[in-house]
Amino acid sequence: EDLCKSLDIPIIAGNCVTYEVAKRLMEAGVAGLMVGIGPGAACTSRGVLGIGVPQATAISDCSSARDDYFNESGKYIPIIGDGGIVTGGDICKCIACGADAVMIGSPIARATTAPGNGFHWGMATPSQILPRGTRIEVGSTGSLERILKGPALLDDGTHNLYGAIRTSMSTLGAKNIKEMQNVEIVIAPALLTEGKVYQKAQQLGMGK
């Protein structure tokens, strides 16, 4: 709270995964909130510390805190989903769970112009004593423009992220982010495998 009051710039805090912590940070005066502990491709926090909450649950709980805080104070604090986001579908699910925005690492690291040359280093906690990140090879799959805007060369949802969001929103009948945050969510693991026998056998699309 003292930090937020002492600085003339907006403070984005995180990362948190629970309703209680999210609400307290909002009451302390943060301008935005990062949500997610451990889901990142290069993050090892869950293994090193044994701490973490599934990302969909974390975003849902923290967005509930945002809505309650808004009703109480009139101040809207954006929720930023951070970690485990690889495909356009991942982004869409984060928004459906309540996120106002997302932060992505691996998709950007796969750009041919990324400085890692196909590697992604989890540096959220670069402690020399107890590091919680590792260096992983994600490969280089295309230009940053192709990854974000297409046209896609890959069929696994990692290219044309903007297009995925637009198409998902139109399919759901959502005109904006706020409407997409209110769509019905169904927990259905079978959606990833139902009817995908040939994709899985041939290592294509969702079968990779």
Name each model feature, range by range.
Residues 1-10, 38-57:
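Glycine-rich tight-turn/loop motif centered on a GG-T
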Residues 31-39, 104-105:
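Non-cysteine beta-strand/loop elements that form the S-adenosyl-L-methionine
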Residues 12-15, 37, 81-85:
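Glycine-rich beta-strand-to-loop/alpha-helix junction loops that act as flexible
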Residues 7-8, 28, 50-81, 86-208:
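Alpha/beta catalytic cores of nucleotide-metabolism and tRNA/nucleoside-modifying enzymes
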Residues 16-21, 86-88:
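Short acidic loop-to-helix transition motifs that present clustered carboxylates
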Residues 21, 42, 111-112:
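Generic structural signal for helix capping and beta-alpha/helix-loop junctions
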